[in-house]
């Protein structure tokens, strides 16, 4: 066991060093005038991603369910330097609505360079699976099928611009996590679909890119409210997370791990030492607060 722990530590240090010393730099001017659609952008990571693109002079469209919050986010984008800022209220539980959002973005922005898929939904609580099917169906519908519908509707515009698709995934899409069965299922589906799509772009010699952001526990209002008293770990900054997501998108990186040191080592070791990884991760849960 001591040898395994030493190996784990060595890999963590090695990959962390590689990550920081091999990081590419991003030219913000390359984003000026680009056209960006961000879903789930009335709050949390999506809101912060909108602000990051706005600071670089992009044309922004934000979408979520709350109209007033979208108006506020769009106004803030303009203050931060967005070339233009638009908004449309939508419910991603309706695939027709998802298709409409993509078409509206293309029409209002005159095309599309970045499709950022960030919304999340479903009625599943953080707890033991008790056999209910509605949360599973809802999660797959909103967190997977609507992503595919948006991609399908925006694909022609993205092909014309040789643009980028950015998908918010999770460590739960790489390593099955307890108490989030429906959420895990939707994230594993995202990982499979968009990894496959990325390979298709490459085989067509297309410059289109797919960036999958594999995220950990981020200090969004929704995440903290849902799991804050159920896990013994610190949440990472949503502002820092958004900056890293935008950087990865602009550089057309296939994957982003954030926080890097909290996710990448476990993903690397999952297949080698699955029992050890599960034991370490399970220690973060406060079982007496989970039903």
From Swiss-Prot:
Binding site for substrate: 170
Signal peptide: 1-18
Family: Belongs to the short-chain dehydrogenases/reductases (SDR) family.
Record protein name field: Hydroxysteroid 11-beta-dehydrogenase 1-like protein A
A cellular component term, taken from the record's GO annotations: extracellular region
Coiled-coil residue spans: none
UniProt keyword annotations, A-Z: NADP, Oxidoreductase, Secreted, Signal
Subcellular location: Secreted
PANTHER family registered for this protein in UniProt: HYDROXYSTEROID (11-BETA) DEHYDROGENASE 1-LIKE B-RELATED (PTHR44279), HYDROXYSTEROID 11-BETA-DEHYDROGENASE 1-LIKE PROTEIN B (PTHR44279:SF5)
Active site annotation, chain numbering: 183 (proton acceptor)
Entry EC number(s): 1.1.1.-
Pfam family, one: adh_short
GO MF assignments: oxidoreductase activity
Protein function: Unidirectional NADP(+)-dependent cortisol dehydrogenase (in vitro).
Main subcellular localisation: secreted
Catalytic activity: cortisone + NADPH + H(+) = cortisol + NADP(+)
Gene that specifies this protein: hsd11b1l-a
Binding site for NADP(+): 40-66, 91-92, 118-120, 183-187, 216-222
Entry annotated with the keyword Signal: yes
Source organism: Xenopus laevis
